[in-house]
Amino acid sequence: MNKRKHMDIRRLIISLPAIMALWGGLASCDKMIYDNYDDCPRGVYVNFYSQTECAENPSYPAEVARLNVYAFDKDGILRSANVFEDVQLSAAKEWLIPLEKDGLYTIFAWGNIDDHYNIGEIKIGETTKQQVLMRLKQDGKWATNIDGTTLWYATSPVVELKNMEDGADQYIHTRANLREYTNRVTVSVDSLPHPENYEIKLASSNGSYRFDGTVAKADSTYYPGETKVVGDSTCRAFFTTLKLESGHENTLSVTHKPTGREIFRTDLVGAILSSQYAQNINLRCINDFDIRLVAHHCNCPDDTYVVVQIWINGWLIHSYEIEL
């Protein structure tokens, strides 16, 4: 009896290396197990980080909690679509994007797409990277309120899955830089005798995005932002917007409510870029804008006020001469 037990244990010990070798072969697509590599699972591991041109080191934003990740081939056709929940970015963490075939791929990723957005139809093997991925929800001309949320976008360098028959790796690794696609904009108007009579608005045609992070053509949409009186001669409004960039009608306006007359209207991004101090306000590095407009009484037909100075993040970017 004991002799048989010893024999069974010995057989088990002898067979363990064989079992481990078999498991390792299955896990790594060993040629000893597979006749070829056609059924071998493959893919790209992606590490996500965030770093602007102005930052010395990468960061790993804690507010990124969800990732929608897409892989497109060299022809711009979608080959893999994945959603990862409860994300926690770190230098060591990677996410696997499964792929079936050898070839060149680019990874596009969006962080924090939620129920504020409508997602377009997605079909593996048909959808192109130039198609619209999502649209910010809106009611008429007003966008849904995205205060307290952030949106992020990343793209990887082109990566290549090579033929494993030639000794290539089963999986490859890359990184993708998440850039924030939301802005927080505080606008104050000073030197108004009756600040309760004025309304601040901010609109942009940036509510739709393609898979590749570019803005799709859309009508201008107003972002919610209540104008409040914050002093004897000051009113203020706060807005959370999607990415403000040149060419998309980023219109900031101030209206005198009793008459309906606009006392100020400008393309916000255009005003920044046309300023001699534009180099101090790098739109690639800044997501928070503190805008101060200084008003002055003018010799106008309706005896009202106009804006004579524009300050952004402490910089006087424009001043205007008026007839007093």
UniProtKB/Swiss-Prot annotation:
What membrane topology is annotated for this entry? Lipid-anchor
GO BP annotations listed: pilus assembly
Of the GO CC terms on this record, one is:
cell outer membrane
User: Do you know which Pfam families this protein is assigned to?
Assistant: Mfa2 (PF08842)
Question: What Gene3D superfamilies does this protein's entry cite?
Answer: 2.60.40.2090, 2.60.40.2100
Name the domain of life this protein comes from: Bacteria
Main localization of the protein described in the UniProt heading: membrane
Q: What happens when the gene is disrupted?
A: Minor fimbriae are longer than normal and are easily detached from the cell by mild shear stress.
Q: What else is known?
A: The name (minor fimbrium subunit) does not indicate the abundance of the protein, but is derived from the greater length of the major fimbriae. In strain ATCC 33277 and strain ATCC BAA-1703 / FDC 381, major fimbriae are 300 - 1600 nM in length and about 5 nm in diameter. In contrast, minor fimbriae are only about 80 - 120 nm long. This length difference is observed only in a small number of strains, including strain ATCC 33277 and strain ATCC BAA-1703 / FDC 381, and is due to a loss of function mutation in FimB, a protein that restricts fimbrial length in other strains.
Q: How would you summarize the oligomeric state and partners of this protein?
A: Mfa2 is not part of the fimbrium itself, but anchors the fimbrium in the outer membrane via its interaction with Mfa1. Linear, head-to-tail oligomerization of fimbrial subunits mediates assembly of the fimbrium stalk, while the minor components Mfa3, Mfa4 and Mfa5 probably form the fimbrium tip. The anchoring subunit Mfa2 limits fimbrium length and is important for solid fimbrium attachment to the outer membrane. In its absence, the minor fimbriae become very long and are easily detached from the membrane.
Protein's job = Anchoring subunit of the minor fimbriae. Regulates fimbrial length. These filamentous pili are attached to the cell surface; they mediate biofilm formation, adhesion onto host cells and onto other bacteria that are part of the oral microbiome. Fimbriae of P.gingivalis are major virulence factors.
Q: What name has this protein been given in UniProt? A: Minor fimbrium anchoring subunit Mfa2
Q: Organism, per UniProt? A: Porphyromonas gingivalis (strain ATCC 33277 / DSM 20709 / CIP 103683 / JCM 12257 / NCTC 11834 / 2561)
At the highest ranks, the source species' classification is: Bacteria, Pseudomonadati, Bacteroidota, Bacteroidia, Bacteroidales
